Curated annotation (Swiss-Prot):
Belongs to the DnaJ family. One of its GO terms (molecular function) is ATP binding. Participates actively in the response to hyperosmotic and heat shock by preventing the aggregation of stress-denatured proteins and by disaggregating proteins, also in an autonomous, DnaK-independent fashion. Unfolded proteins bind initially to DnaJ; upon interaction with the DnaJ-bound protein, DnaK hydrolyzes its bound ATP, resulting in the formation of a stable complex. GrpE releases ADP from DnaK; ATP binding to DnaK triggers the release of the substrate protein, thus completing the reaction cycle. SMART domains: DnaJ (SM00271). Binds 2 Zn(2+) ions per monomer. InterPro entries: DnaJ, DnaJ_C, DnaJ_domain, DnaJ_domain_CS, HSP40/DnaJ_pept-bd, HSP_DnaJ_Cys-rich_dom, HSP_DnaJ_Cys-rich_dom_sf, J_dom_sf. Its cofactor is Zn(2+). Zn(2+) 1 binds at C149, C152, C201, C204. Pfam families: DnaJ, DnaJ_C, DnaJ_CXXCXGXG. This is Chaperone protein DnaJ. GO terms for biological process: chaperone cofactor-dependent protein refolding; DNA replication; protein refolding; response to heat. The gene is dnaJ. One of its GO terms (cellular component) is cytoplasm.
Length: 374
C-alpha cells in the first residue's frame, strides 16, 4: 500500500494545534465525503486516509508515537489504522469523529452494533450571503441521503443472513499481548460489529443502503454566522428499522465589501478627508437597516470609533442586538497640484509657530546631542 504522511493528508503543519487539526479534518472530510463524490474510487481512498490521519493526530498519545517513530511506532503498539478494513467500516467510524468535531451533536443511537453501517446524522455545508445570514431567509436545498436496502433490510448480506465474526467471536474486539501488557482494539475483520457477511446482497453490493435525493425548504434564522449549525429534525439518513437521523447544516457566510462582522457587532470604515479633520463635520453613513447620522467633532483622530447601540446583528438565540461601530479612516490626497500646494503652504504659515511644532519640540535637543560627543 502506498505510504502517506498524516500531516500532508490534512494539509497542516507538524506544529498544528488540536483546534487546527480538527478544522483541517472537517474541511478535508467534507471535500472527499462519499455523498459529494458518488462513484469516485479516488475520493473514497482519500476519505479513508483523511479519517485515519485524524484518528491518529487528534489523539495526543498516538500523535507523539507517530511524530517520533512514524507508522511503525503505531503498529508496534497495536494501532493498525485502516489496514484491511472496508470502506463501510471507515464510514462507521465517523460517528465518534463527528462528535468530536461538531461538539457532540450527533446521535449515538446510529452507532450501536445492531444499527446500520453508517451514522444516521447527515452533515452538509450551507453557503449564505451576508444579507441572508443577517436577516434570515427561506432556502431551497437538495440533500442526498442513505436509506436501508429493502432487499437485505440494511444488513448488506444476501437475504439478510449474518454470521458471527470468527476472528473476535462476536465481541467486536481482539486482544494483542505485548510483554506483560494486553491491549484491546477494534476487530479489523468486522470493524467492531461482531458480525460477518458471508455473501453480499446483490442489490446494494453489501453496502446495506441505497442513495436517495430530496428537495427541502429550510428556514434560516436571523443572525446565523459561519460555523453555526442548523439542525433539521429527521432529515438525515434512514436506518434499517425506519429510524431517521437529523440533518446538520454547517453555515458558511460570504463576506461583505463594506460591513465587517465580529460576533453580533458590525464594523464600518468611514473615510474622512484630512482637511475636514480640524473642522469636524456631520455625515450620513449606511447601516444594516438604512442610514445613520454621524457627528464627527473637530480634531478627530485616525481610527477613532463611534458606537451606535443596537444597530448590529440580532442575536440568533435572543432578541438582543449588537452594535454598529463606525471607525474613522483619515484620507490624504495621492498628489497635489501647484495651486493646492500654495494654499497648503499659506495655511501652514498662517499658524505661525503652531504650524511648525517640531521646532519647539526639538528646541535644545541638538545642542544636547553635540555635548555628548564633545
Amino acid at each position: 500500500m502506498e505510504e502517506f504522511d498524516y500531516y500532508e493528508i490534512l494539509e497542516i503543519e507538524r506544529s498544528a494545534s488540536g483546534e487546527e487539526i480538527k478544522k483541517a479534518y472537517r474541511k478535508m472530510a467534507m471535500k472527499y465525503h462519499p455523498d459529494r463524490n458518488e462513484g469516485s474510487s479516488e475520493a473514497e481512498e482519500m476519505f479513508k486516509r483523511v479519517n485515519e490521519a485524524y484518528q491518529v493526530l487528534s489523539d495526543e498519545g498516538k500523535r507523539q508515537l507517530y511524530d517520533r517513530y512514524g507508522k511503525q511506532g503505531l503498529e508496534s503498539q497495536g494501532y493498525s489504522g485502516f489496514s484491511g478494513r472496508g470502506f463501510e467500516d471507515v464510514f462507521d467510524d465517523l460517528g465518534s469523529i463527528f462528535d468530536s468535531v461538531f461538539g457532540g451533536g450527533f446521535s449515538s443511537s446510529s452507532r450501536k452494533r445492531s444499527g446500520p453501517k453508517y451514522n444516521l446524522d447527515l452533515a452538509m455545508e450551507l453557503d449564505l450571503s451576508f444579507k441572508e445570514a443577517i436577516f434570515g431567509c427561506k432556502k431551497e436545498i437538495k440533500i442526498r441521503y442513505k436509506d436501508a436496502c429493502p432487499d437485505c433490510k440494511g444488513t448488506g448480506a444476501k437475504e439478510g443472513k449474518i454470521e458471527t465474526c470468527p476472528d473476535c467471536g462476536g465481541r467486536g474486539q481482539v486482544f494483542i499481548r505485548q510483554g506483560f501488557m494486553t491491549f484491546a482494539q477494534t476487530c479489523p475483520k468486522c470493524g467492531g460489529s461482531g458480525e460477518r457477511i458471508k455473501e453480499k446482497c446483490p442489490k446494494c453490493n453489501g453496502k446495506g443502503h441505497e442513495n436517495k435525493e430530496e428537495n427541502l425548504e429550510v428556514s434560516i434564522p436571523e443572525g446565523v454566522d459561519t460555523d453555526n449549525r442548523i439542525r433539521v429534525s429527521r432529515k438525515g439518513h434512514v436506518g434499517k428499522n425506519g429510524e431517521r437521523g437529523d440533518l446538520y447544516l454547517v453555515v458558511r457566510v460570504e463576506e461583505d465589501e463594506h460591513f465587517m462582522r465580529h460576533g453580533n457587532d458590525i464594523y464600518l470604515h468611514v473615510p474622512l478627508f484630512f482637511s475636514t479633520v480640524p473642522l469636524g463635520t456631520t455625515l450620513k453613513i449606511p447601516s444594516l437597516r438604512g442610514e445613520l447620522e454621524l457627528k464627527i467633532p473637530p480634531n478627530t483622530k485616525d481610527k477613532e470609533q463611534f458606537v451606535f447601540k443596537n444597530e448590529g446583528v440580532k442575536d440568533v438565540h435572543s432578541a438582543k442586538k449588537g452594535n454598529l461601530i463606525a471607525q474613522v479612516k483619515i484620507v490624504y490626497p495621492a498628489k497635489i497640484n501647484d495651486e493646492q500646494r500654495e494654499l497648503l503652504e499659506k495655511l501652514s504659515r498662517s499658524f505661525g509657530v503652531e504650524g511648525t511644532p517640531h521646532e519647539k519640540g526639538f528646541e535644545g535637543v541638538f545642542e544636547k546631542i553635540k555635548g555628548w560627543f564633545s
